[in-house]
Amino acid sequence: MDEEIELINTNTRNEKIKNFLSINKKKIIISICALTLLIILYFLFLEIKERRKIKLAERYNKITIEYLSDKKKDIKDRLVEIINENDSTYSPLALYFLIDNQILKQNDEINELFDQVINKTKLEKEIKNLIIYKKGLFNSDFLSESELLNILNPIINSESVWKSHALYLIAEYFYSRGEKVKSKEFYDKIVGMQNNNPHIKLESQKRLNRDF
């Protein structure tokens, strides 16, 4: 008796499955096709992204080789084009190359390119903080106190690995201008931090012991 009931239940269940498949056949086929298409598009996107990265690397390497070979025609414009690609690797590298080799000397234009990389390029958090720090370092010789702090505040008010670097830059900024009270405040912050750069902490402690 139990076997007959089990057989009936099995047959009923199988019949329900058949009916469901029959009724929803088109929906199932469409869903499978849509899922397959999404997978294909995803891998196609990755392939296109990888090819774009390779081409960008080739462009950047070609520019730097030509520059070092003293072929400097249109170097600035070509590097700016790479910056405007908003690539997480080669846009910052192109900006650094422009600055380090003094290809671009107008401060306003350089700061615009810094902002382009910082605000429009998808970067890892600490890479972004590094670029913000580099912007502060670049501007530290000619900006006012409030302007420099405005640049570095996103790092100073965070727990970034670059926080001690930013604090040290501000401390040295005030020290070079003879503002020892303000300078000491930032050296003290560095020494009192738990998670900081050991070298910067040591240099800050030396400065405090020697000059305050």
Please provide the spans of the model-predicted regions:
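TPR-repeat structural position
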Residues: 53, 72-73, 107-108, 145, ...
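Acidic, proline-/serine-/threonine-rich low-complexity intrinsically disordered segments
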Residues: 2, 10, 54-60, 69-76
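Acidic, proline/glycine-rich low-complexity intrinsically disordered segments
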Residues: 2-10, 65, 119-123, 127
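Flexible helix-coil transition and linker loops at the boundaries of alpha-helical arrays
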Residues: 47, 83-85, 119-123
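Short extracytoplasmic
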Residues: 62-93
